[in-house]
From Swiss-Prot:
Organism: Bacillus cereus (strain ZK / E33L)
Protein name per its UniProtKB record: Sulfate adenylyltransferase
GO molecular function per UniProt: ATP binding; sulfate adenylyltransferase (ATP) activity
InterPro entries, per database record: ATP-Sase_PUA-like_dom (IPR025980), PUA-like_sf (IPR015947), Rossmann-like_a/b/a_fold (IPR014729), SO4_adenylyltransferase_pro (IPR020792), Sulfurylase_cat_dom (IPR024951), Sulphate_adenylyltransferase (IPR002650)
A Pfam short name: ATP-sulfurylase
Lineage, uppermost ranks: Bacteria, Bacillati, Bacillota, Bacilli, Bacillales
Protein encoded by which gene: sat
């Protein structure tokens, strides 16, 4: 199935901003959203959502024109700033003293944040990191088309920071007709490796696309994770079958809705397939184990433009003496080595080494070294 959808390109570094006086300050989430809007990562979006599209996305997981889109991409401003703005104006988008873009204001509105929390995150509990962030951000949304007038200079992983047009080119260069995307915000342990390689058996290439935008404080730092991906790919994956590049978005922790969002974005990066595992983009116990897979039943593959691949929870089985899942292994829980990401972080922080059935030794070494460094700097 083809994924040739038109990529939005709203990057124009020659755009004249000299006559624009007003400005809106962007937080880190809005800044990463601005870049992904401009480079086509969020195609078909061409800007921050206006009220009509926002309401439609929150209520129906579709834009007002019917296209599937599951996460509201919004630009929040304070009441004070909103009072100075008018529909029809061009306003500069600023972060850390730099102008990164311009928005043509089409809409200024006050969202019902409780409704957004309930429908997007399925909870209004402020202990949920996505809801907490939603409530912390300002209370008025500004919608409108954007232009990115300045590229970010201090990307932490410049050699892995590729726009959708570039990843598509890379896949083409490698002759990959089918590419499976894998989203992660964690180090890749044996369970993920098993799933990725199972998927790789049926496609030409694997696109490992770790998220390096804002995550919650107890997630393993991005630089440590990147090093762990490098050693894993170097030692255990065929180099001509895998491509590593970062996804600079913030983590929303919106579970099922974010699974759809992650699939749509990977389609833009050039993937034909997308891996959805257990509790994709989940946090705590807010979502059912396979809810992020079940939500895909609401959409056709044609509408999505990408084929989801669903995987059960995998583990090492001491009886099978292999990685397996409940689909392939008949043995009981007592034979399964299952460690959660949280459990692994705990072991590593205590300097304990997870078993080789759980994680590759090279990955463990990188993580222990990284976490020691973290302790020293805290």
């Amino acid at each position: 199935m083809s994924t040739v959808n038109e990529l939005v390109n709203l990057v124009d570094e020659t755009y004249d901003i000299s006559q624009i006086e007003k400005e809106i300050g962007l937080d880190n989430i809005a800044l990463s959203d601005l870049e992904l809007l401009a480079t086509g990562g969020y195609s078909p979006l061409t800007g921050f959502l206006g009220k009509k599209d926002y309401d439609s996305v929150v209520e129906t997981l579709r834009l007002a024109n019917g296209s599937v889109w599951s996460i509201p991409i919004t630009l929040p401003v304070t009441e004070e700033v909103a009072e100075t703005l008018k529909v029809g104006e061009e306003v500069k988008l600023v972060n850390g003293g730099n102008v990164y873009g311009v928005i043509q204001i089409e809409d200024i509105f006050v969202p019902d944040k409780e409704k957004e929390a309930l429908l997007v995150y399925k909870t209004t509990d402020e202990a949920h990191p996505g809801v907490k962030k939603l409530y912390e951000r300002p209370n008025v949304y500004v919608g409108g088309a954007i232009v990115l007038t300045k590229r970010f200079e201090n990307n932490p992983f410049p050699s892995y920071h590729l726009d959708p047009i570039e990843t598509r080119e890379e896949f083409k260069k490698r002759g990959w007709k089918t590419v499976v995307g894998f989203q992660t915000r964690n180090p890749v342990h044996r369970a993920h490796e098993y799933i990725q390689k199972s998927a790789l058996e049926i496609v030409d290439g694997l696109f490992l696309n770790p998220l390096v935008g804002e995550t919650k404080s107890d997630d393993i730092p991005a630089d440590v994770r990147m090093e762990s991906y490098e050693v894993l790919l170097q030692n255990y994956y065929p180099k001509n079958r895998v491509f590593l590049s970062v996804f600079p978005a913030a983590m929303r922790y919106a579970g099922p809705r974010e699974a759809i969002f992650h699939a749509l974005v990977r389609k833009n990066f050039g993937c034909t397939h997308f891996i959805v595992g257990r509790d994709h983009a989940g946090v705590g116990d807010y979502y059912g184990t396979y809810e992020a897979q079940e939500i895909f039943a609401n959409f056709t593959v044609e509408e999505l433009g990408i084929t989801p691949l669903f995987f059960e929870h995998s583990f090492y089985c001491t009886k099978c003496e292999a990685m397996a899942s409940t689909k392939t292994c008949p043995h009981g829980k007592e034979d399964h080595v299952i460690l959660s990401g949280t459990k692994v972080r705990e072991l590593l922080r205590n300097g304990e080494v997870p078993p080789s059935t759980f994680s590759r030794k090279e990955v463990v070494e990188v993580l222990i070294k990284g976490l020691k460094k973290e302790v020293v700097t805290e």
